[in-house]
From Swiss-Prot:
Superkingdom assignment: Archaea
Alphabetized Pfam families for the sequence: MFS_1
This protein's UniProt keywords: Cell membrane, Membrane, Transmembrane, Transmembrane helix
Membrane protein topology class: Multi-pass membrane protein
Protein name per Swiss-Prot or TrEMBL: Uncharacterized protein AF_2102
InterPro entries: MFS (IPR011701), MFS_dom (IPR020846), MFS_Efflux_Transporters (IPR050189), MFS_trans_sf (IPR036259)
UniProt cross-references to PROSITE patterns, sorted A to Z: MFS (PS50850)
Organism this protein belongs to: Archaeoglobus fulgidus (strain ATCC 49558 / DSM 4304 / JCM 9628 / NBRC 100126 / VC-16)
A GO MF label: transmembrane transporter activity
Amino acid sequence: MLLIYGIFAFVVLVFFYLLGKETGGEMEEEYRLREYLEVLKNRNVVILSVIAFIGVGIFTAYLTWVEPVLEEHGLTVETAGLTATAFLLGGIFGSIIIPALSDRAGKRKPFLYLCFIISAVLFYIHAIAFGMAMVAAVLFVLGFFFISALPLALDLSATSVGEQFAGTANSSLWLFSQVGSVVLIVLFESMASWNSTLLLSAGLLAVSFLLALQLKE
């Protein structure tokens, strides 16, 4: 069903583009396209866009299917939703603390490495953890490191191209992240078991770590 919604939204977007263009706006659209293509020549932006595809895709897909995932780990429908809040709560703290530490150090890459590798390990631990207390503890720490990677990626993307193109660079990350969300939501649902989605997430975050090694700061 989500795939159908995604296709429908894409068709609507195409019709809007073809029929809803303002008069005299062709030169402006051409300029924006050239600007976007110019930004995509930046290696950091391309790598971070792929990382956003993976990271935000995992985040959205996990929260979409969190109840059946946690039910496989001994939680009821009622406790699954409550336990999942630990993931978001950890993310709130992480998104404040990790970027602040990064600012103090004047570095982004080491903290991205840390976030990705710890998140990959914690998704694996999540796959073998059972019981409300254990799962909640894992989710809190996972959210702390996993969610805090996004503000670091956005900042590194913006600084890689300069203030003039910062908005365009970050829009690329958001575009790829939305595509990743649709793709991974559908992929998670099609997998053999919900537990296998956690192992897939761990593997994809390991790939993100390897991609982050190619970033320049």
